[in-house]
């Protein structure tokens, strides 16, 4: 859902010059973690379920201990502190439990991906309103036919 949209937005706004990945915290442990290097920016979109967050916190701690990255950004229902972990940016998105009750509570999660895409597009000298130099990507999806069912 949200992580996939953030990854697509970054790739679109950087004209494919920045390649992103998305996964669940558990899924990330099984392979995708191999792409982490000194040029990586990690964005963690954390759950508001405390039982789930235990596993998310463990992965963040493990990555912090074993890797050097450009930055680690955490979006969570409330500001988090993980002892011994240096997080570069913590976005307190909403109150705990709010994601389950309020469909608008996810907006701060999406906004982080939008802002990263926008500023990286500008950093690369692209126009965020029309980042596709080749014209492969447009603001409106084109060429899709709607067929009768």
Language model features: what each stretch is:
Residues 1-149:
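A SIS-like phosphosugar-recognition module
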